[in-house]
């Protein structure tokens, strides 16, 4: 049955991912099964090379599993073609990177509008107003017409979160989103992620910052491609 029915938004069933090496196959993920519910804030932790980023890439459809099944929002992601994946990802997954990756020659509002232009999800005459509303949500509306270089690191990360929300995706994936921010700014970013989950978004974050564990419904620890343990925090 190629569907998951209930409030589970992300479901991995016996997922493995291998990469060829000179000495044989290297398994970044090994027989991973995982269910994540709608509206939850989830942390993924583990040492470098443990499989954290591969897990995020599998959920986002950036990588396909070698074995197993991947469902996101009732779609069997691992069966989509490359062209189908590009369209699906643009509408269903918002990605926030550690280093923001805003285009430096575009203004903040132009950066936020880019995913809307790519997916053509909203009428062109509505996109600027939607982008302004998202910048208002992340408290940097007054920075809309500035270039990224004029903003602080925390403001740029807020802009990146607004961009990730551009097409109203149900899932936000963030890879070390506060790794280069001071503690106060990082706290404000986690506060924002928490607000997003209360509005129904599912947020999955790779993080090493244990001081923010109280924000998460669950902490998933990965070691050598295997889920080592899952700590329910609420």
Predicted regions: what is each one?
Residues 219-232:
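H-loop (His-switch) and adjacent beta-strand-loop-beta switch element
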Residues 9-10, 15-222:
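ABC family nucleotide-binding domain
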Residues 1-18, 229-234:
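ABC-family P-loop ATPase nucleotide-binding domain
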């Amino acid at each position: 049955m190629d569907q998951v029915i209930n409030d589970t938004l992300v479901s991995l069933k016996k997922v493995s991912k291998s990469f060829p090496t000179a000495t044989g196959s290297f398994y970044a993920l090994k027989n991973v099964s995982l269910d994540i519910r709608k509206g939850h804030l989830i942390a993924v932790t583990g040492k470098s090379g443990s499989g954290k980023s591969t897990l995020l890439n599998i959920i986002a459809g950036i990588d396909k599993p070698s074995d197993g099944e991947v469902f996101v929002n009732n779609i069997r992601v691992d069966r989509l073609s490359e062209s189908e994946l590009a369209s699906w990802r643009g509408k269903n997954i918002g990605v926030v990177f550690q280093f923001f990756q805003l285009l430096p020659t575009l203004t903040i509002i132009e950066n936020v509008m880019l995913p809307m232009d790519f997916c053509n999800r909203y009428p062109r005459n509505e996109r600027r107003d939607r982008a302004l509303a998202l910048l208002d949500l992340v408290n940097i509306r007054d920075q809309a017409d500035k270039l990224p270089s004029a903003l602080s690191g925390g403001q740029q990360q807020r802009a990146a979160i607004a961009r990730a929300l551009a097409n109203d995706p149900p899932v936000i994936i963030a890879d070390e989103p506060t790794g280069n921010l001071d503690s106060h700014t990082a706290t404000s970013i986690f506060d924002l992620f928490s607000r997003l989950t209360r509005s129904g978004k599912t947020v999955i974050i790779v993080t090493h910052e244990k001081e923010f564990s109280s924000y998460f419904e669950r902490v998933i620890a990965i070691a050598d491609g295997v889920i080592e343990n899952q700590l329910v925090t609420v």
